[in-house]
């Protein structure tokens, strides 16, 4: 899949563990999600590799981007489209050397525009700011001003992703504020019907662009 900035757009699903994760990811893809990030902090490396490989193949079937959270080795092993790095997840330069020029490398920038500039200069392809709203997934996260979504793009020239507490009731706010994509966790993967939740989020996003 050739890397185009326009691919990094819309509703961006970040997984959380659940026993039927493959079925849930298939459901959100049917619902119109175009980006999936696999996030699993467990120590079961074999299960994570098997699960990530299956999800990568599933995303390929739907023409969606598949990224791995934190783990560059896992991203390389399953031929993911890229990796998302947090504060302590290793250097962008090292990830680029391992994954190659065609891989997507995203970075968490919290509320730090200087960090965004620095990591894009090192080779990151997109920057994520948040938590934009209070997050049920990471309640300890500080809040980032919504203005960063637009100023971050202007400062770096790269797509910006909003993350933190985003659901169907507020996704229109981050769309209107200039985010290229909205990362969603609980509103998709804690939903009783992930496909319906995805359709609602995608519709709200599209109405607000």
From Swiss-Prot:
Query: Quick one: which residues bind Mg(2+)?
Result: 70, 89
Q: Which reaction does it catalyse?
A: 2-[(2R,5Z)-2-carboxy-4-methylthiazol-5(2H)-ylidene]ethyl phosphate + 4-amino-2-methyl-5-(diphosphooxymethyl)pyrimidine + 2 H(+) = thiamine phosphate + CO2 + diphosphate; 2-(2-carboxy-4-methylthiazol-5-yl)ethyl phosphate + 4-amino-2-methyl-5-(diphosphooxymethyl)pyrimidine + 2 H(+) = thiamine phosphate + CO2 + diphosphate; 4-methyl-5-(2-phosphooxyethyl)-thiazole + 4-amino-2-methyl-5-(diphosphooxymethyl)pyrimidine + H(+) = thiamine phosphate + diphosphate
According to the record, cofactor stoichiometry and binding are noted as: Binds 1 Mg(2+) ion per subunit.
Quote the record's binding site residues for 2-[(2R,5Z)-2-carboxy-4-methylthiazol-5(2H)-ylidene]ethyl phosphate: 135-137, 165, 185-186
Signal sequence range: none
Q: What superkingdom heads the lineage?
A: Bacteria
E.C. number = 2.5.1.3
First-level EC class: transferase
**Under the cellular component aspect of Gene Ontology, which terms does the record hold?**
cytoplasm
Q: Where does 4-amino-2-methyl-5-(diphosphooxymethyl)pyrimidine bind?
A: 37-41, 69, 108, 138
Query: Which pathway features in its UniProt record?
Result: Cofactor biosynthesis; thiamine diphosphate biosynthesis; thiamine phosphate from 4-amino-2-methyl-5-diphosphomethylpyrimidine and 4-methyl-5-(2-phosphoethyl)-thiazole: step 1/1
Q: Which InterPro entries match?
A: Aldolase_TIM, ThiamineP_synth_sf, ThiamineP_synth_TenI, TMP_synthase
GO-annotated molecular function: magnesium ion binding; thiamine-phosphate diphosphorylase activity
Tell me if Metal-binding is a UniProt keyword of this record.
Answer: yes
The record's Gene Ontology biological-process terms are: thiamine biosynthetic process; thiamine diphosphate biosynthetic process
Q: Which UniProt keywords apply?
A: Magnesium, Metal-binding, Thiamine biosynthesis, Transferase
> Which cofactor(s) are needed, names only?
Mg(2+)
HAMAP family, alphabetized: TMP_synthase
Sum up the protein's function in the record's words. Answer: Condenses 4-methyl-5-(beta-hydroxyethyl)thiazole monophosphate (THZ-P) and 2-methyl-4-amino-5-hydroxymethyl pyrimidine pyrophosphate (HMP-PP) to form thiamine monophosphate (TMP).
Give the family per the record: Belongs to the thiamine-phosphate synthase family.
Q: What is this protein called?
A: Thiamine-phosphate synthase
